[in-house]
Amino acid sequence: MSKINKEIAIFIVFLILVALWGLFVKVPVEETKTPDPESQVSGMTIQFKDGISESEVRTILQNCNMTRNYRMTYDNSSEDYYIMADKDNWSDIRRELVDEMKETNKKNWTVSTPAHVIRKEDYYVLPISGQAIKDEKFLAILDKYDIGVEKFLWCDISFLYSDGPLTYWIPKEDAIRIKNELEQNDNIFSVQFDYLFPPFDPTT
């Protein structure tokens, strides 16, 4: 075998070995994970008691570490109503409302699923409909227990750019801390999250 043919044969054997190595050896590939769609909170919707002023809302928010600049929208024009019943009368009031709704086939008085009933210290907060506050039988039950109709006040929080582009969100862990802190306030019923969708992916 000539020297050239021997070199060609060696080269072919080398290529075969490289091919076999490629089949059996797995080259590690860096995995990129898509951010969890509920990991980036872009804003919050805060449910306040009736009668709280815009200046009071701003003071409450200023006393909470929001971690990022934000825009606040104060809305006192909603038509979302509620009643507050103390824990001693709650069962009786709830039963009378349910019985009356069944008897008169008026199922639109309340939003009565457990997810919508809010416990605030010694009171239960029950959302009610606009139709209910115009119904004499419904109002008669409230009069019996000396309960008035009130309106929820809503406040929307939108987090803003402050540390460069595409930073208009906070981590869910920070949002949960803020939520827990705000819901300790007597004037706040609940805090709901608005998520960034689609989530910001720093790898793209």
Curated annotation (Swiss-Prot):
One Pfam family hit: UPF0228
Matches recorded under InterPro entries: UPF0228 (IPR008887)
Family as reported in the entry's similarity comment: Belongs to the UPF0228 family.
Protein name as catalogued: UPF0228 protein MA_0511
Annotated organism of origin: Methanosarcina acetivorans (strain ATCC 35395 / DSM 2834 / JCM 12185 / C2A)
